[in-house]
Amino acid sequence: MGRGRVELKRIENKINRQVTFAKRRNGLLKKAYELSVLCDAEVALIIFSNRGKLYEFCSSSSMLRTLERYQKCNYGAPEPNVPSREALAVELSSQQEYLKLKERYDALQRTQRNLLGEDLGPLSTKELESLERQLDSSLKQIRALRTQFMLDQLNDLQSKERMLTETNKTLRLRLADGYQMPLQLNPNQEEVDHYGRHHHQQQQHSQAFFQPLECEPILQIGYQGQQDGMGAGPSVNNYMLGWLPYDTNSI
């Protein structure tokens, strides 16, 4: 019984797709080699995987020479503006470098997805163990950095606390000195004010009691006229009568 027709379509299962690619690729490379040996043909085979990895086979000594021959056959004799062999070599080298970088980029993306817990199905036991060690190492580094950051913050806060404590202590000392300085300069301020007011009042009383004597050109003996008023008090002439000699003959 013959084998049924296989429907050609993209394989959805990733693992099955990779397995099929590896088998068909090896078979294709084997067929190209057999064709070049059995038929003495110049065969060049270039394969790129879906991840950008390059697989090639060339029956001649140089893939570049086969490509130049292919270009001549398809596009005729090279024109003056056609790149030379050196230019093609540079272009091919650049392309290979690009493929290497792309492969590296894909590997880094794949590693990143694995670290995030994605696409872990195709990984083997050793790869999973290696991934676990990487995660443990990364976790230790993160914890160490976090601890160091917290210690730095704690040291900064302690330094600020010491500065604030010193500032508070200095302000308290200045405030205490400000209260004590007026008392040291004038400790009996209230007494001085009291005596000052008393002395001023005594001066006013003395000035009111002792009136200045007015010198008159004519000495008047006896009381002054009644126009001075009864409540004016004794005058200077009245005081003089007390000590003048009393002349009985004048009466």
UniProtKB/Swiss-Prot annotation:
The keyword Manganese does not apply. Residues 94-177 form a coiled coil. SMART domains: MADS. Disulfide bonds: none annotated. GO terms for biological process: cell fate specification; flower development; mucilage extrusion from seed coat; plant ovule development; positive regulation of transcription by RNA polymerase II; seed coat development; specification of floral organ identity; specification of floral organ number. Residues 3-57 form the MADS-box domain. This is Developmental protein SEPALLATA 3. It comes from Arabidopsis thaliana.
